[in-house]
């Protein structure tokens, strides 16, 4: 059993899925992703997750060795990073009360925001959450991990290590794609 599975087992031991809500076919899954959320997805959040590329709210089908396999919505997993992200941020704007690390203020929350990666010409990636405060011109980019870090991490591709792809503070006013925001 992998470390990730051991941690997930421990989570279930301390907070089991109620029998009426468990997915009888899949260990570590609710029968419905809605049961894994603290509150229902609002219209904007549901639309964002439905338009995302990760099948967070819908089952997927694929053929494996000639057999049709249906996988549940990813948010139905007790180890779902997207469910964790939504449970932390919810439907309403997020408020940061202190300015110890991030500027205090109220931030609009967008889930599955598409943003281009450092490799030119690639398809945009879906960011788990994007928080923006137009008044202070501040953006917070959130890529959340629940238990993924317990698996076998792969090395970063060379493109991610090339500093030429990254924004530098002194370029902020010369046409950077995010020049409307303060980055940190």
Regions found by a protein language model. Name each.
Residues 151-184:
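Acidic, metal/cofactor-coordinating or nucleic-acid-engaging core segments within structured domains
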Residues 130-141:
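Active-site beta-strand-loop-beta-strand hairpin of nuclease catalytic cores
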Residues 1-118, 124:
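Nuclease-adjacent, charged terminal/linker segments that flank catalytic cores
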Residues 88, 139, 165-167:
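Hydrophobic transmembrane signal anchors and adjacent membrane-proximal interface regions, especially
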Residues 120-129, 182-184:
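A Trp-anchored, charged/polar loop motif used as the substrate-binding/catalytic surface
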Residues 93-94, 134, 147:
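Residue-level marker of positions within ordered structural domains that often coincide
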Residues 129, 145-155:
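A short, conserved, highly charged catalytic patch centered on acidic carboxylates
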């Amino acid at each position: 059993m992998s470390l990730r599975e051991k941690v997930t087992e421990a989570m279930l031991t301390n907070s089991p899925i109620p029998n009426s809500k468990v997915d009888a076919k899949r260990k570590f899954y609710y029968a419905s992703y809605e049961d894994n959320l603290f509150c229902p997805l609002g219209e904007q959040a549901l639309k964002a997750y439905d338009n995302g590329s990760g099948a967070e709210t819908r089952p997927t089908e694929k053929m494996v060795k000639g057999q049709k396999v249906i996988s549940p919505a990813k948010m139905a997993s007790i180890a779902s990073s997207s469910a964790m992200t939504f449970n932390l941020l919810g439907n309403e704007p997020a408020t940061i009360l202190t300015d110890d690390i991030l500027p205090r203020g109220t931030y609009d929350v967008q889930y599955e925001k598409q943003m281009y990666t450092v490799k030119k010409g690639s398809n945009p990636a879906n960011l788990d959450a994007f928080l923006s405060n137009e008044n202070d011109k501040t953006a917070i980019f959130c890529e959340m991990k629940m238990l993924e870090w317990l698996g076998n991490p792969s090395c970063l591709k060379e493109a991610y290590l090339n500093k030429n792809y990254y924004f530098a503070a002194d370029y902020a006013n010369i046409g950077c794609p995010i020049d409307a925001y303060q980055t940190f």
